[in-house]
């Protein structure tokens, strides 16, 4: 007997409920026009990398725990003397999530991490890029449950970019609201 294939909770919710809600709201001519999540990119820049070259590796380990996937170490493209950065010097880590891992991360972000952010008043509804992608920043990476607070020697911020197939910001905003993103009023 074949086992049932695992499907993330938010993906199931998208297929069963969110697609229908988006179709009713925007009345698309074709079912393929309904926007969906494409990918989530998480970037963690480590400014202290100029002083200690081990910092990006530690940040990458934390990012791997958060994302559930090994990140790539980002390197400086060119030298900037003012920042004491040399070309090819490791300066951060980033990871691109797609498929099931993307939906799992989104579920943890919206339901666990964002409510744990200090003085959180909602996400800025203007943080869209004009092409249906949403960007946000988190100042402390310890809001994620995978990070053990006692073992953290330094806190890093991170940028989270949610890429959708929506063509306008209004469509993307409606899609993310259906995914329970807590936008500011």
UniProtKB/Swiss-Prot annotation:
Taxon lineage: Bacteria, Pseudomonadati, Pseudomonadota, Alphaproteobacteria, Hyphomicrobiales
Transmembrane stretches, start-end: none
PANTHER family reported for this sequence: 60S RIBOSOMAL PROTEIN L11-RELATED
Name used for this protein in its record: Large ribosomal subunit protein uL5
Biological function: This is one of the proteins that bind and probably mediate the attachment of the 5S RNA into the large ribosomal subunit, where it forms part of the central protuberance. In the 70S ribosome it contacts protein S13 of the 30S subunit (bridge B1b), connecting the 2 subunits; this bridge is implicated in subunit movement. Contacts the P site tRNA; the 5S rRNA and some of its associated proteins might help stabilize positioning of ribosome-bound tRNAs.
Keyword terms: Ribonucleoprotein, Ribosomal protein, RNA-binding, rRNA-binding, tRNA-binding
Keyword Ribonucleoprotein: yes
Family of the protein in this entry: Belongs to the universal ribosomal protein uL5 family.
GO MF assignments: rRNA binding; structural constituent of ribosome; tRNA binding
SUPFAM superfamilies xrefs: RL5-like
Description of how the protein assembles with itself and partners: Part of the 50S ribosomal subunit; part of the 5S rRNA/L5/L18/L25 subcomplex. Contacts the 5S rRNA and the P site tRNA. Forms a bridge to the 30S subunit in the 70S ribosome.
Pfam families for the chain: Ribosomal_L5, Ribosomal_L5_C
GO CC field: ribonucleoprotein complex; ribosome
GO aspect biological process, one term: translation
Gene: rplE
Keyword Ribonucleoprotein in annotation: yes
